[in-house]
Amino acid sequence: MSAIALDRAAVRVAVDGRPAPKILLEELTVRLTEQRIGIIGANGSGKSTLLRLLNGLVVPSSGTVTVDQWDTVRSVREVRRRVGFVFTDPLSQLVMPTGREDVELSLRRSVKNARERSRQAEETLDRFGLLPLADQSIYELSGGERQLLALAAVLAVDPEVLVLDEPSTLLDLRNRELLRRTLAGLSQQIILSTHDLELALDLDRVLVVDAGAVVFDGGPAAAVAHYRALCAAGLAASGAAADAARPGWPHSENPHLENPGLENPGLAPQRPGQL
């Protein structure tokens, strides 16, 4: 399994009219080693920024991010061969007219024989129940079908790590269950953000992100309870991170998180080989 490490990584951006940069992600030191990791939080909390650090789509303003010792800035090609990324909006990464062509494009670098490439593409599409739709225009597919196609195209090249940004957002109940079963059967390390708290409960470890900071890191049940408490208190994405850092709140239960200010109140288109 891949070892992903953030060492004092932070993301800041300049904003016109503001004397100081806007902080998208507070400085964070953490190791991501579990098989299935989730990131939960309100819209705008910093979930996507954190995920995009993991394969070099976002460059840290300070600190470093490494995947198996490969730096995401200096060795971005090596990182992207290992880390597959699925966006919330599948049209951000589906670039061919049909699903068949898109999956075959993903395989082009690793599978040189056209017949074998076609066979593997069909096998991948069938795995997701998409083979009957393989030759339809991607614009004729539903949002959920496009999302499954984007996932299929990334998995076709067998990345070591699969990063998914809110993968169930566009899926109906049937396809959400298909997604959950598919993820459960994968050998890859999975790191995903989600608003689907039932999906979060399937994971090994969950981080709660609020206002650009990780405010909880631990088991899924405790993390979901923590996030629900933030939402009930009206704190999520509105300064809860500052509240969570005040003295007297218990520390995160996860020993991988190394942030002395992180405490909790006791209560988750680039393809591998393409650049």
Model segments located where?
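Conserved ABC ATPase "signature" region
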Residues: R115-L133
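The feature captures the beta-strand-to-loop junction immediately N-terminal to the Walker
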Residues: I40-A42
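Conserved ABC transporter NBD signature motif
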Residues: G63-R74, V79
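Conserved ABC ATPase signature
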Residues: S137-L141, E145
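Conserved beta-strand-loop-alpha-helix hinge in the C-terminal portion
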Residues: A213-A237
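Catalytic Walker B motif of ABC-type/P-loop ATPase nucleotide-binding domains
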Residues: L162-E166
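Helix-to-loop junction immediately C-terminal to a conserved catalytic motif
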Residues: N55
